[in-house]
């Protein structure tokens, strides 16, 4: 029997307001890197392409992405992420301390402990792959439409869409919205 038994991960906070708790992750698809974040209450999804080889990569890029989120949605109480180098860098830890943000790392032994981020990555990858044109490049208008549909699609459990939870109303679009998620 190993001397270091695996202990279950620290339980995430239960958010009561939108963007009080968010889950974040990075992923790679078709030669591009993306930062994805999801509000744990509403399911609101944000996807940002990260330009490798610029100041958008690494911890500096993570902090730029988080500042954009905070300027739009407010300062979260808790951010959940994996233990990737961007999230565990000294600069990131200092940023979280300065802003009073609790950083919850998912366990390598319990990857599902950051399930909201994993679901966000899966959704973002599907949207990106579904909206690549014949030339192989991303159709940005189609991607925006996909995000609008995602944000307007009601959750089967609570019967509200991320937009309804966050804004109190659906987003204005000019196309039908699916009621299935």
PLM regions with names:
Residues 1-126, 156-181:
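Retroviral integrase
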Residues 45, 128-135:
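Short amphipathic alpha-helical interaction patches enriched in hydrophobic/aromatic residues
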Residues 69, 127, 131, 149:
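Residues that form generic nucleotide/phosphate-binding pockets
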Residues 132-145:
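Short, charged, surface-exposed loops that flank catalytic or proteolytic processing sites
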Residues 148-156:
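Core structural elements
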């Amino acid at each position: 029997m190993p001397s270091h038994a695996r202990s279950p991960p620290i339980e995430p906070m239960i958010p009561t307001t939108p963007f009080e708790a968010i889950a974040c992750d990075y992923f790679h698809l078709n030669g591009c890197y993306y930062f994805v974040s999801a509000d744990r209450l509403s399911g609101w999804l944000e996807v940002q392409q990260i330009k490798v080889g610029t100041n958008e990569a690494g911890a500096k890029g993570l902090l730029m992405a988080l500042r954009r989120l905070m300027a739009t949605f407010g300062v979260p109480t808790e951010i959940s992420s994996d233990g990737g180098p961007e999230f565990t860098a000294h600069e990131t830890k200092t940023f979280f301390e300065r802003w009073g943000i609790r950083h919850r790392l998912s366990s390598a032994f319990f990857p599902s402990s950051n399930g909201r981020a994993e679901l966000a990555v899966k959704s973002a990858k599907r949207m990106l792959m579904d909206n690549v044109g014949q030339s192989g490049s991303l159709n940005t208008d189609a991607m925006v439409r996909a995000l609008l549909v995602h944000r307007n699609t009601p959750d089967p459990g609570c019967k509200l869409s991320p937009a309804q939870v966050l804004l109190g109303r659906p987003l204005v679009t000019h196309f039908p919205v699916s009621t299935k998620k």
